[in-house]
Amino acid sequence: MSESLHLTRNGPILEITLDRPKANAIDAKTSFAMGEAFLNFRDDPELRVAIITGGGEKFFSAGWDLKAAAEGEAPDADFGPGGFAGLTEIFDLDKPVIAAVNGYAFGGGFELALAADFIVCAENASFALPEAKLGIVPDSGGVLRLPKLLPPAIVNEMVMTGRRMSAEEALRWGVVNRVVSQSELMDSARELAQQLVNSAPLAIAALKEIYRATSEMPVEEGYRYIRSGVLKHYPSVLHSEDALEGPQAFAEKRDPVWKGR
C-alpha cells in the first residue's frame, strides 16, 4: 500500500485517509493504491461501509497532481482500477462510501467526493471544478454527476468558470448531507457509518443496484424493470434470512442481527 494512503479498520467500517502534503493531490501511483483499497473494500465480506477523507485540515484533495502532469503524466494516463482516485469508475460497488471532506475539494478531489454515496463536510470545506481554466475538462465524473445534482445554470458556471461553492451553499443545494465543525467531522462521518451498519447489508446493496439501473427511467418503466428478475440483489432480498430477521427483531423489541443472506 502507498505511503500516501492510510487504512484503518474499525470493525465493519474502513477509513481511508489520503495524506500527500501539501494538497493531497493524486498522481497515477496514488490512484492505483486507492483503487486497490476500494476494490478490497468491495470484496471483503466483513467490511460494510468506507469513509474517505484527507489528511490535515486544509485540503480534502486538490485533485490531479499538476506536478506529475508537468513531469509528463497525461490527463488520460492509466489511473488504475476504479478510475481516477480509485472510486470514480467503480460501478458495481454495492456498499456505501462516505466522503468526509475536511477542506478544499477541487477538481478530481470534488469528483472523488461526488462518487461517494454521502458527503459530510467541515464548515471550511469548499468545492470547485477548475479544469477548464487549466485547459482540460472534469471527465472523472464531475461533468457527468454534477448535472444530476444541480440546475444547469449553476453547473455551467462551476464547470466553465471554476467558481467555488461553499459548504453551506452545497448543503442548500443538497450536494452534501451534513456540514459540521472541523473538530466534529470524523465523529459525524462515523456516526453516519454506524447508522448504515445498522441497516441490512442486502437491502443497501439492492437499493444501490436499483438506483444505478433505474435512475434515468420513468417510474412505471422502473417498476417493470426491478420486477423483471434481471437484478442480482433485489430478488435475493425478498427471500432472504434478513427479510425475516427484521420484522422478527422488531416484534421482539431487540436489535436485528444481520447475516447478509
From Swiss-Prot:
GO biological processes: carnitine metabolic process; fatty acid beta-oxidation
Record key words, sorted: Lyase
Gene3D superfamilies assigned to the protein according to its UniProt record, in alphabetical order: 2-enoyl-CoA Hydratase, Chain A, domain 1, Lyase 2-enoyl-coa Hydratase, Chain A, domain 2
PROSITE patterns: ENOYL_COA_HYDRATASE
Catalytic activity: (R)-carnitinyl-CoA = crotonobetainyl-CoA + H2O
One GO molecular-function entry: L-carnitine CoA-transferase activity
Annotated metabolic or biological route of this protein: Amine and polyamine metabolism; carnitine metabolism
InterPro entries: Carnitinyl_CoA_dehydratase, ClpP/crotonase-like_dom_sf, Enoyl-CoA_hyd/isom_CS, Enoyl-CoA_hydra/iso, Enoyl-CoA_hydra_C
Residues annotated as catalytic: E111 (nucleophile), E131 (proton acceptor)
Catalytic activity, EC: 4.2.1.149
Keyword presence, Hydrolase: no
Function: Catalyzes the reversible dehydration of L-carnitinyl-CoA to crotonobetainyl-CoA.
NCBIfam families (alphabetical): PRK03580.1
Homology family: Belongs to the enoyl-CoA hydratase/isomerase family.
Alphabetical list of PANTHER family matching this protein: ENOYL-COA HYDRATASE, MITOCHONDRIAL, ENOYL-COA HYDRATASE-RELATED
Protein name according to UniProt: Carnitinyl-CoA dehydratase
Organism: Salmonella paratyphi B (strain ATCC BAA-1250 / SPB7)
